[in-house]
């Protein structure tokens, strides 16, 4: 499990295309960070939101295109920690829980 605040998304194939504190028309990924204050791209972990049957519930619940109200929400996500978008990230997110502050 990884835990953090949803702080944006990546608009491309590299963390260099990160968009902080913006909603998205994309459903493919989100960025999470330890807090919502003084966030830099280097503080973020990209999370892949896959389309497979094991992952679609997480994608539908967390993507910022369909859920702009989830920006700045705290969440725990279960997936595979691996390189994604050129940095350490999370792929195959298959479970999630929203966390109260």
Report each predicted region and the residues it spans.
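OB-fold single-stranded nucleic acid-binding module
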Residues: 1-101
């Amino acid at each position: 499990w990884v835990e953090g605040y949803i702080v944006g998304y990546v608009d491309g194939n590299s963390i260099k295309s990160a968009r902080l504190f913006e909603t998205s028309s994309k459903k493919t990924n989100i960025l999470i960070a330890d807090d919502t204050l003084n966030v830099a791209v280097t503080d973020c972990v990209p999370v892949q939101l896959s389309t497979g049957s094991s992952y679609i519930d997480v994608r539908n619940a967390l993507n910022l295109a369909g859920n702009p109200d989830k920006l700045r929400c705290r969440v725990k996500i279960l997936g595979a920690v691996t390189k994604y978008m050129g940095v350490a990230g999370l792929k195959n997110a298959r479970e999630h829980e929203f966390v109260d502050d």
